[in-house]
Amino acid sequence: MAVSYNALAQSLARSSCFIPKPYSFRDTKLRSRSNVVFACNDNKNIALQAKVDNLLDRIKWDDKGLAVAIAQNVDTGAVLMQGFVNREALSTTISSRKATFFSRSRSTLWTKGETSNNFINILDVYVDCDRDSIIYLGTPDGPTCHTGEETCYYTSVFDQLNNDEASGNKLALTTLYSLESIISKRKEESTVPQEGKPSWTRRLLTDDALLCSKIREEADELCRTLEDNEEVSRTPSEMADVLYHAMVLLSKRGVKMEDVLEVLRKRFSQSGIEEKQNRTK
């Protein structure tokens, strides 16, 4: 079972006391009140830091004081990179909300993005059941790999075993994003003249009326699985059709599935009524 540090990280973010420049108070009463407020904030920070220290004490660090840390995209599920952390690196990540690691070669902390500005913004931190490995769950500002690839994992072992090196770099994608990648390739191919019968995806990409009519048709068939009390197995089948055709429309519009999932994530803590009121008209 994984343990989340999200609540603690949010508390630290809210409680930090940042003073942009020194304050001078001519009013003695005002100065007195401000001292009480700052002291209160200091006490809260001390209490929160004590919680952080307690959590860090429970991590099973190796004989060098390190643990493996894996960064994962909160929206796509893609594994971005893997590094090592010590107590200070994990503590810094929790407080700064930026993925921070420990460099074994330089024996120093480093924050992903400190030179490239491709930071990984941390939304949560998880520790595995044995408390000896960590997941940084967040959103990347850009490519994570120093090669410019989206993630550091783009070499398929099975492709190499099958001598299929012609396929080139291939990101480790989940089913949903593998489908998005295929649709994207079909979109690129649709600009090139083709002999013979085009694929169904290509037809949809080149015919807006057909695409929209299929989305409406498949959505209606999905609803009928409920209204007509069809076999339960029909529901995921029809939903797959809706999702596929909707993703073709997204590709046509230049919208990534990641953008959709980001919208959903941001709605988790917001009611539907509030969301509608805040929509840009």
Swiss-Prot record:
Gene3D superfamilies, A to Z: MazG-like (1.10.287.1080), Phosphoribosyl-AMP cyclohydrolase (3.10.20.810)
Catalytic activities: 1-(5-phospho-beta-D-ribosyl)-ATP + H2O = 1-(5-phospho-beta-D-ribosyl)-5'-AMP + diphosphate + H(+); 1-(5-phospho-beta-D-ribosyl)-5'-AMP + H2O = 1-(5-phospho-beta-D-ribosyl)-5-[(5-phospho-beta-D-ribosylamino)methylideneamino]imidazole-4-carboxamide
Keyword entries, A-Z: Amino-acid biosynthesis, ATP-binding, Chloroplast, Histidine biosynthesis, Hydrolase, Multifunctional enzyme, Nucleotide-binding, Plastid, Transit peptide
The protein's annotated pathway: Amino-acid biosynthesis; L-histidine biosynthesis; L-histidine from 5-phospho-alpha-D-ribose 1-diphosphate: step 2/9; Amino-acid biosynthesis; L-histidine biosynthesis; L-histidine from 5-phospho-alpha-D-ribose 1-diphosphate: step 3/9
Compartments in which it is found: Plastid, Chloroplast
Stored Pfam families: PRA-CH, PRA-PH
Protein name listed in UniProt: Histidine biosynthesis bifunctional protein hisIE, chloroplastic
Presequence positions on this chain: 1-50
Organism: Arabidopsis thaliana (Mouse-ear cress)
